[in-house]
């Protein structure tokens, strides 16, 4: 399938993409957290931020920026530490709000939803490993002799985004269903938020120690 567009072993790629999307990460956790705390609207706004951020990174990977980042340690470290700092900021904010017994979002609906989208977008964009991953993964399924490899890259990128959309939609709908139950269980909600905050701190530590 799509062999005429320079895509190799598409079905193998699709299986690999599904497994990759299922691996827990900060983006997935952020979407799930907001679907529980802010409902389906908050969850899908977070997902939109992730989708746009990933699309930008995929385009940059195709444009050759990934090679620049890989061969320029200073640039890689700048993006890496910015991402780690932002993850630490999100985790600390969640933990602080949980300990104080407050909601980590503001009371105003519009600023809250706008902030969710912006945080998800920044979270997605400040991950230098993602852009390097897209190149190393996609290149295995692209025929370098194809006349238009950009089309091949677009097909693979779109497939990954669709798989991600399906999985995140499942998380958002599931999170929305348990929202009412969580809100009636104060202690359970506090424990859940604390674990989410700690996981973000853990993701920050892991990103800060990664090498290009």
Swiss-Prot record:
Q: Which Gene Ontology biological process is one annotated for this entry?
A: L-leucine transport
Q: Which family does it belong to?
A: Belongs to the Rht family.
Under the GO molecular function aspect, what terms does this record hold?
antiporter activity; L-leucine transmembrane transporter activity
Q: Name the UniProt key words of this record, in alphabetical order.
A: Amino-acid transport, Antiport, Cell inner membrane, Cell membrane, Membrane, Transmembrane, Transmembrane helix, Transport
What is this protein identified as? Answer: Leucine efflux protein
Q: Topology in the membrane?
A: Multi-pass membrane protein
Source organism phylogeny: Bacteria, Pseudomonadati, Pseudomonadota, Gammaproteobacteria, Enterobacterales
InterPro entries, A to Z: LeuE-type
Function field: Exporter of leucine.
Gene transcribed to yield this protein: leuE
Q: Per the record, GO CC terms?
A: plasma membrane
State the source organism's domain of life: Bacteria
Q: Which residues cross the membrane?
A: 12-32, 49-69, 71-91, 122-142, 153-173, 188-208
Instruction: Give the UniProt subcellular location, in the record's own words.
Output: Cell inner membrane
Pfam name, any one: LysE
Q: What is its main location?
A: membrane
Q: Does the keyword Cell membrane apply?
A: yes
Q: Which reaction does it catalyse?
A: L-leucine(in) + H(+)(out) = L-leucine(out) + H(+)(in)
């Amino acid at each position: 399938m799509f062999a005429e567009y320079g895509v190799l072993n598409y079905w193998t790629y699709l299986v690999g993409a599904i497994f990759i999307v299922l691996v827990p990460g900060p983006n997935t956790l952020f979407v799930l957290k907001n679907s529980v705390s802010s409902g389906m609207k908050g969850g899908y706004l977070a997902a939109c931020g992730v989708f746009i951020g990933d699309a930008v990174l995929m385009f940059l990977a195709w444009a050759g920026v990934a090679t620049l980042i890989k061969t320029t340690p200073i640039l890689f470290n700048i993006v890496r530490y910015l991402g780690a700092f932002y993850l630490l900021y999100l985790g600390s904010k969640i933990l602080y709000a949980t300990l104080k017994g407050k909601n980590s979002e503001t009371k105003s609906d519009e600023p809250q939803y706008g902030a969710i989208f912006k945080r998800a977008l920044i979270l997605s964009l400040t991950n230098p490993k993602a852009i390097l991953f897209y190149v190393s993964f996609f290149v295995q399924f692209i025929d370098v002799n194809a006349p238009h490899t950009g089309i091949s890259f677009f097909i693979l990128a779109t497939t990954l985004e669709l798989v991600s959309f399906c999985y995140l939609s499942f998380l958002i709908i599931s999170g929305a269903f348990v929202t009412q139950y969580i809100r009636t269980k104060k202690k359970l909600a506090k424990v859940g938020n604390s674990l989410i905050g700690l996981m973000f701190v853990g993701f920050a530590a892991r990103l800060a120690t990664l090498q290009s």
